[in-house]
């Protein structure tokens, strides 16, 4: 069957009904049935009917407020008759005539009233044996009932329908009868995040989950619908999962094309099943014991035995409540006093305490059983043997506490109760055996009170209390102002909880004082108690008595007497033996449950920040030890963390990739470095060198050193070549006696005076004799140098390399093809492409990643948490032996010790000296805190990337979500886009990860069933409630000390608590590429790594035809200001002419610059200003506006701010970029040096050639 209902409606029954009319309304005649094809709907009649209904409702409201008139008095009696006659019709009419709720109940709010009004027709109760177990809902054209709800629908028409069951959706579905279609509700698949309505108030919808405050829903609500503000059904409730302060709902809901079922982890079905208990092989509802009016007050011992027989049944607590309150079948309101009712069936006890405050052993009435410190806010829950909030009769008394004094229960003032560690603790709550208190750090814990005789009774145990801080600051006093962080605390409520303690029938208490010796006989003084005695003198001196009894011819040493009482329970303490080996027990709720709350923590003083060049200096002023950490946002995070407890100064290196630091509980701060420097890229050579030295010191030193070396080598080579040429010219004349050196050669080779005229004489001779030769001789060298310089300059201009480092846009090509592109996987970095299509005006496409989520596929191996050691009361077999039996408990240990001789406060527990045995047991279980504080061990597999991408083209500007896998297609404005797969298959998660609260750790944990004591995974289970618990804690039982009833044992401390102290930094603080690690589900957000290929199909309708677009001419560009390596730090003015105003796409066709604008509004003969970002000091890039193109040339200056809180919108440079001015100076230097070298080469070649001809 299709589980998507059809939206078919004939009217809405949940609209405001017509108000009651106090006057008689005549019956309207039944209209004649007309075939719908022949009868058109009369719109005017419908409008008139609506108007009449509105006027009637308004008139009724006025009549209600009017004083009683004659007409109203006349109609009062007929009204009563009419109501009496209307009490019989169908169930639907009964529902309309329901009496108003009792005044005691809380008035429902607006949401509840709205839902009740809608639910009045569209939901029906499902009943089993007369009890409501859930609901069925009419949605669209179908009736839907949760499959797990047992029973039949309380409507004869719906009950006889044939339902089809779907185990996948946990639904049973059938077609609604035609006559009931008007009662159905609409449904919708539209679910924007926000608040919705249901029977119990508001439902919050966020991140695909419906949640409610814990306690707002309960078993029996299965099948209830959730409505939006228009009264449409958005989901049907199936159950819930308790997550602390809120409960996540398990629902069936609809998407656009299908039905989905959302089932949070730990979901429980909310069907109100009927709980059954047993009594003498007879079943009965647990809430209604068959022995009415019997209850605990009338038959205490029989009632306790009945409870022990049903202790493991689901309805045990209903049976316990019914037995203790002795209520009749009508349900009473619960109160705080009723929470204490169960304690009337229990009693305090005396237990062994190793240190009763004075360093000596005693049997203390306030013995400390357990100290629980699971609350992260430092609160302790202490269990003692006394009972607080009760008087000695067992009734609730907030100012009293009761304790055991011998065989009797006494009471004292609660105000005398004290708890100490290194100083007095602050007690916040008490109930029964439990105390909740805040204590200062210490190495022991002591509880004490003053008894009825003003004597101090105490017990002291060794316990190290050193609570871990909440957050990142170790504060002592809770601040007035701060920030709220999630934490756990013991909720100060005495209401029943999921936690429980075991109770058992107490043993017989030996008391030697009951025996007295009189004239060779032993007298047993009962004193109104039941005494079990055993005397070895004579025969048949064994039994019980409630009256005084005398044993003739006997001695006290031959008798053993003990008080027996089985009409009360006592806590199953390892310091008190149990009555029998079968360990019959009961259970009692534990107050003050651990719950998720928020704790106010301080905010560290903001540090003094000084920004420097590629570094930031923080001056930290901690008021208490405060955590300071930082990491790089690049591929190698280099995490650093420390606790600072005094004034400190820290210098953090900041790179262009960015860093993130966090001080205390302040939010993390991200900073990026900019390419700031001294000097100017367009100044004199020393300013240019200073500029590049600030950016690239090593490269600048290398370049300047290389250039200087080349210049020196060039000059040296020039001088060497000229000297060689001179030597070759003069050598022949030097070897020939009387030879005369020619004038020209003498001038070129600087011949000696003896062989040639001086330069002045030669030049004077040429001036007198031949002036033409004089000018040719003087200008020859200058002409050669000028010619050489021109040649070198032309050569350099032709071969001038483009800037080594251009703006790469993180690997994205500026010119995208029509159907493919590659965008950077960097949040906030815009990718732009210019798309041209014949007959259409060019269009700019902009793609920008808004958010990215990398979610691994996880397989939960197990959960681990803190364990608790369960030590049942030991069983002591007097004058006999006992045997251990195997039990299905984790890490179960059992041993029998012979030859024990235990004592209790009243004397020896056993009559025999050496034939006694003690059976000691212990096993491991999950601590009660595991529901709130546990770690999950996962195996992580292939991660899938889901990205939120903003797509802009033409008039479309839309954000969409897509899976980056190369298959998932999204439609935006009629265009189809397919993203992925991503270029880099990278994930910050290892194969094994551990999730603890909101932190994720890469950790190699042991597999299931292989845990080691004291290490992570010493206890393991699939869920926090599953029965497959594995434990390995090195639990070993020890022999009890002589004369003491106790169960000593040794055990390795919790591996989970050890792991919490040694776990180190989480992946949240050291993930590379700036990833933000989140949980629920586990994912890495906004990782700046890799590129995303995009395939797209853009229809022609997205383009503007050429004839419709403005024709732009005379386009020119003038850069007003330019700051390179800054986020859109340059401004350019485009001047143009156009034939008509309109919108034009503007785009940069070069990778050197990225424009901020995608489209501009053009006007006739106007100008437009655009912003661009460039990493080059001398960018030159082509810009197009519609079909016109021009070139923008700029001379950019370096940025002024060293550090900024945002990343640049361009790629950082890897190789130094040469400015135009720097290239000009290089050309000039190269021309000069090259000219000198070329002259030297020419001279040397000529001289060599002439010499070789001789």
Curated annotation (Swiss-Prot):
Intervals of motif Nuclear localization signal: 70-108
Interaction with the capsid protein: annotated span: 724-728
Primary enzyme class: hydrolase
Extracellular face of the membrane: 270-694, 757-771, 815-1231
Disulfide bonds: 122-137, 277-286, 291-295, 294-326, 353-459, 356-362, 425-439, 487-599, 535-559, 537-554, 729-750, 865-930, 878-910, 879-912, 884-894, 1075-1087, 1117-1192, 1122-1196, 1144-1186
S-stearoyl cysteine: lipidated positions: 1249
Chain segments carrying region Binding to the viral RNA: 95-123
Residue segments, region Functions as an uncleaved signal peptide for the precursor of protein E3/E2: 271-282
Lipid-modified residues, S-palmitoyl cysteine kind: 719, 729, 750, 1249
Enzyme Commission (EC) number: 3.4.21.90
Region listing for Disordered, in residue ranges: 60-112
Record bears the keyword Glycoprotein: yes
Region listing for Dimerization of the capsid protein, in residue ranges: 192-202, 228-232
InterPro entries assigned to the protein according to its UniProt record, in alphabetical order: Alpha_E1_glycop, Alpha_E2_glycop, Alpha_E3_glycop, Alphavir_E2_A, Alphavir_E2_B, Alphavir_E2_C, Flavivir/Alphavir_Ig-like_sf, Glycoprot_cen/dimer_sf
Keywords linked to the UniProt accession: Capsid protein, Cleavage on pair of basic residues, Disulfide bond, Fusion of virus membrane with host endosomal membrane, Fusion of virus membrane with host membrane, Glycoprotein, Host cell membrane, Host cytoplasm, Host endoplasmic reticulum, Host Golgi apparatus, Host membrane, Host nucleus, Host-virus interaction, Hydrolase, Ion channel, Ion transport, Lipoprotein, Membrane, Palmitate, Protease, RNA-binding, Serine protease, T=4 icosahedral capsid protein, Transmembrane, Transmembrane helix, Transport, Viral attachment to host cell, Viral attachment to host entry receptor, Viral ion channel, Viral penetration into host cytoplasm, Virion, Virus entry into host cell
Membrane-spanning parts: 695-715, 772-792, 794-814, 1232-1252
Peptidase S3 domain mapped to chain residues: 122-270
Note: Belongs to the Old World alphaviruses that usually cause fever, maculopapular rash, arthralgia and myalgia. Structural polyprotein: Translated from a subgenomic RNA synthesized during togavirus replication.
Protein name according to UniProt: Structural polyprotein
Originating species: Ross river virus (strain NB5092)
